[in-house]
Amino acid sequence: MFGSAHGDTTSSDTSGRRPLRLVVLPLLLALSSCKVDLYTQLQEREANEIVALLMDNGVDAVRVAGKDGTSTIQVDEKLLAFSIKLLNGKGLPRQSFKNLGEIFQGSGLIASPTEERARYVYALSEELSHTISDIDGVFSARVHVVLPHNDLLRAGDTPSSASVFIRHDAKTNLPALLPKIKMLVAESIEGLAYDKVEVVLVPVERSAQEQRSLLEPDLAQASRPIPVPLLAVAVGVGAAVFAVTCYLLFIVLGHRRRQLTGELSRVQERPGVSALAAIRKKIPALGRR
């Protein structure tokens, strides 16, 4: 009898582990929702802007803060290509610019006048490009500065000039700011005249999905599909609930079966007593059937 009881216990433990696996596996699948890194080493402000844009277009994006103060954007692996195209159309992440301090930091070597002049021109271009990129509606901007090396002893000097390239949202009335942009560039460079600044504006149309989300925000919100990670979590939770229910039912039936087995064993030890009759006494419902 002891051997039989030990065998029943071992079988019960082994069988009880299977429902536990059914509970744990869906939860693990739900928690590991196939998130991949979209962009890393981002500043917090730009990372929040990217997350807001992705979520407005139906992408479940997550910002993960790093120990160095930068942020990482994670999205579902299936939406990685769509997210990259969407952000590229918006000029995100923005190009990083160097400031004057980074360009002229001490290198320990004596630079030639030509090298110093090249650094100065490059620094002016970077600073102006960064400033223009901060204008609302501007996706990207580049400023090219030309500072000719004129001889003070010679007449007919070549004037300085600058060219500005701006890629912006077509919905933004950036042409209205054109005089101010030219004035900004002219006043930032010594010896540069206003009429020597040329600005090229390149408007970028919104995608059909973005236009629909802007014109019909309520409809877009109502018809937005459930993000894949949330759907995986819902399926995992439902499977976990079903597995727990099956596990509890399995325990109840196993306990009931062990009770009947114990009753049958005790009846078999009594001489002259019918096993079926003893069980019917214990379970009146079976006798009535």
Curated annotation (Swiss-Prot):
NCBIfam families in the cross-refs: III_secr_YscJ (TIGR02544)
UniProt protein name: Nodulation protein NolT
Record lipid sites (S-diacylglycerol cysteine): 34
Cellular compartments annotated: Cell outer membrane
Its membrane topology: Lipid-anchor
Record-stated family: Belongs to the YscJ lipoprotein family.
Transmembrane segments: 233-253
Role this protein plays: Regulates cultivar-specific nodulation of soybean.
Lipid attachment locations (N-palmitoyl cysteine): 34
Main location class: membrane
Pfam families: YscJ_FliF (PF01514)
Domain of life according to the entry: Bacteria
GO process terms (BP): protein secretion
Gene3D superfamilies linked: 3.30.300.30, Hypothetical protein rpa1041
Induction: By flavonoid signal compounds.
